[in-house]
């Protein structure tokens, strides 16, 4: 099932931006583009607390603040909107990748088929997820390592398209007169 990462323009192009949200979003997208999960996974990175990318209602939402990033998990848009719950605060892009990646791997390993992260968090409790990731550094690093290991052979579909010869829409047919 697909993943998507939505970003706002962040500090690069917005006077309110406190963090470079597009850079962080690109890093997340490249890390996770071929990830399989129990259900679709939506991520968002907002460059400031104004939350233009709607990070507060995504499976994993990253919100830039003056001192780094706040990570929210378990949000859901749509008819039954669920506001994501505050998970932790980090300072670097590397920490964003590690903490959000560890959470997604925990969800991949323990989530039920067709269960969104909001229902997963409702079932196991936010405290459980925090204990596995925030309170257990070795466990977090192991979860993140398993995620990266599972994605190491993924091929970027855009890169494959760029290396092949362009496909022609119409191929001439030789006709004998």
Residue ranges with predicted function:
Residues 129-137, 174-177:
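Extended hydrophobic packing segments that form well-structured cores
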Residues 143-177:
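Charge-rich, low-complexity terminal tails
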Residues 1-66, 163-177:
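Small-residue-enriched alpha-helical segments and adjacent helix-cap loops
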Residues 42, 47, 51, 56-116, ...:
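Mobile "lid/hinge" segments at catalytic clefts and subdomain interfaces of large enzymes
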Residues 30-37, 101-113, 134-138:
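Generic secondary-structure signature for well-ordered alpha-helical cores
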Residues 4, 20-28, 92-99, 125, ...:
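General structural feature for long, well-ordered alpha-helical segments within catalytic domains
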Residues 5-8, 44-50, 118-129, 152:
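A glycine-rich phosphate-binding loop feature that marks nucleotide/adenosyl-phosphate handling sites
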Residues 1, 37-42, 109-123, 140-150:
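Flexible, glycine/charged-enriched surface loops at secondary-structure junctions
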């Amino acid at each position: 099932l697909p993943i998507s990462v939505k970003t706002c323009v962040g500090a690069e192009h917005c006077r309110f931006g406190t963090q470079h949200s597009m850079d962080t979003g690109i890093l997340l997208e490249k890390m996770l583009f071929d990830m399989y999960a129990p259900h679709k996974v939506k991520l968002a990175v907002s460059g400031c607390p104004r939350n233009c990318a709607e990070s507060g209602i995504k499976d994993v939402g990253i919100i830039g603040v003056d001192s780094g990033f706040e990570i929210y998990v378990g949000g859901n848009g749509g008819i039954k909107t669920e506001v994501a719950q505050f998970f932790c605060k980090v300072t670097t892009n590397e920490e964003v990748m590690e903490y959000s990646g560890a959470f997604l791997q925990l969800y991949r390993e323990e989530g039920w088929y067709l269960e969104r992260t909001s229902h997963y968090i409702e079932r196991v409790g936010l405290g459980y997820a925090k204990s596995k990731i925030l309170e257990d550094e070795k466990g977090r690093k192991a979860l993140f390592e398993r995620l990266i290991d599972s994605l190491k052979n993924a091929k970027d579909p855009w890169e494959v398209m760029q290396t092949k010869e362009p496909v022609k829409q119409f191929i001439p047919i030789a006709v004998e007169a």
